[in-house]
Amino acid sequence: MEQQSQLERLGLFDARVPRYTSYPTAPHFTPAVGEPVFRDWIAAIPAGAAISLYMHVPFCRRLCWFCACRTQGTQSDEPVRAYAKALLAELDMLKSALAPGVRLSRLHWGGGTPTLMPAEMMRLVAGAVLDAFPLAEGAEFSVEIDPNEIDEARMDALAEAGLNRASIGVQDFDPEIQKIIGREQSFEVTKRAVDMIRDRGIASLNADILYGLPHQDPHRIAESVQKLLALSPDRVALYGYAHVPWMAKRQVMIPSEALPDPHGRLRLFETARELFLADGYDEIGIDHFARPGDGLARAQKAGLLRRNFQGYTDDRAEVLVGLGASSISRFPQGYAQNAPATGAHLARIRDGRFSTTRGHAFSAEDRWRSRMIEALMCDFEIRAEEFIRDHGFDAESLSRILTPVAAHFGDMVDADASGLRITPRGRPLTRMIARMFDGYDMAASGHSAAI
């Protein structure tokens, strides 16, 4: 109860803060980064480099009301085929713009619903990608799989293409909650998809589950987590549902009065967290869990965990190139985002141009602030040695930045000459502590609840 009172006093239950999957966050991107800048950054990638590639497929058969992703519904394959054709054209432009010998350390298909593509289309797209950019040794090819939109033929196509990590969205297994959030997907349908994945020898399975959904209570989320544990995923993301109907209009379908209050959200998170830990998962960052042998767990132990748009990653590539509408690329120089609207993106590609419409070029200050935020989000610690060595700080200048944070959060953090650490009892405040290192105006955009 004392911890709850402290968390409340520090504003956890009222705050809205970024998830910090990037810094600066996407609302601060500007049109100053367009296609010419994107081409310059692509040209700077050295020959033979290993990069990551993300391909966005923005289509779904149905629109889930809880989802805030850039997606659109279609009952026909024709828009998907036209989009896949544009992906191939964009891929060809990218290959022409890059130095020779570039390989992939990670290939990820997300959406939307990538498994909406028919099997022959999957083979065509995967073949084109791997012809252009072979997989590096130890590379990971992952795809977001909708259990409602997968069959044997499509799973065969993915397995033959080299899929070695599958990701499925669960959200919640309670039928009443599923109906309210517009995502009906039974445990049996989900298990069938998992069995198809395992039967083909696909080594790793990710799953997403949400807390903070309408009518969720500790008993209901415990039942959903126990069903998920029966499927034995290697990695789990336990995300807080972000109710932002002013940004994601479809969320108006979800009754806000049925949502748990912030104290209830924390109880839901803690209930699920305790079950994952009891089942032998390692806790990764603020909201992920992984089997001890999973790459995320190994990266965390080695101090190599990183933050990206999917949450947490063990990918060490310096460049992530995003293909498709709304995709965001990350370079050592900054971020570049494609046109969010599918039509605008396709028009640019048809004209033989990349669709980069906005982004952000890093300043020196962005770099150290970004690294401090990432260090807190991944390791719950800012090490003074790193920032003195890599970012030009001395002990006094670093202390001027860390001391006010330590004073504000009291015994939720420890601070001394070696740096600043978030204590275990302070970890629910991690995003709020990270916000203290954010140099941008929080009022410029809306964000999700801090818990």
UniProtKB/Swiss-Prot annotation:
PANTHER family: COPROPORPHYRINIGEN III OXIDASE, OXYGEN-INDEPENDENT COPROPORPHYRINOGEN III OXIDASE
Co-factor note (free text): Binds 1 [4Fe-4S] cluster. The cluster is coordinated with 3 cysteines and an exchangeable S-adenosyl-L-methionine.
UniProt keyword Cytoplasm present: yes
Enzyme kind, highest EC tier: oxidoreductase
Catalytic activity as recorded in UniProt: coproporphyrinogen III + 2 S-adenosyl-L-methionine = protoporphyrinogen IX + 2 5'-deoxyadenosine + 2 L-methionine + 2 CO2
A molecular-function term among this protein's GO annotations: coproporphyrinogen oxidase activity
Any single Gene Ontology cellular-component annotation: cytoplasm
Family note: Belongs to the anaerobic coproporphyrinogen-III oxidase family.
Alphabetical list of InterPro entries matching this protein: Aldolase_TIM, Coprogen_oxidase_HemN, Coproporphyrinogen-III_oxidase, Elp3/MiaA/NifB-like_rSAM, rSAM
Gene3D superfamilies, per database record: 1.10.10.920, Aldolase class I
Keywords: 4Fe-4S, Cytoplasm, Iron, Iron-sulfur, Metal-binding, Oxidoreductase, Porphyrin biosynthesis, S-adenosyl-L-methionine
Binding site for S-adenosyl-L-methionine 1: 54, 111, 144, 328
Superkingdom of this protein's organism: Bacteria
Subcellular location: Cytoplasm
Domain Radical SAM core: 45-278
Function in brief: Involved in the heme biosynthesis. Catalyzes the anaerobic oxidative decarboxylation of propionate groups of rings A and B of coproporphyrinogen III to yield the vinyl groups in protoporphyrinogen IX.
Cofactors demanded by this protein: [4Fe-4S] cluster
EC assignment: 1.3.98.3
Biological process annotations from GO: porphyrin-containing compound biosynthetic process; protoporphyrinogen IX biosynthetic process
Pathway, per record: Porphyrin-containing compound metabolism; protoporphyrin-IX biosynthesis; protoporphyrinogen-IX from coproporphyrinogen-III (AdoMet route): step 1/1
Residues the record lists as binding S-adenosyl-L-methionine 2: 66, 112-113, 171, 183, 208, 242
Residues bound to [4Fe-4S] cluster: 60, 64, 67
Protein name per Swiss-Prot or TrEMBL: Oxygen-independent coproporphyrinogen III oxidase
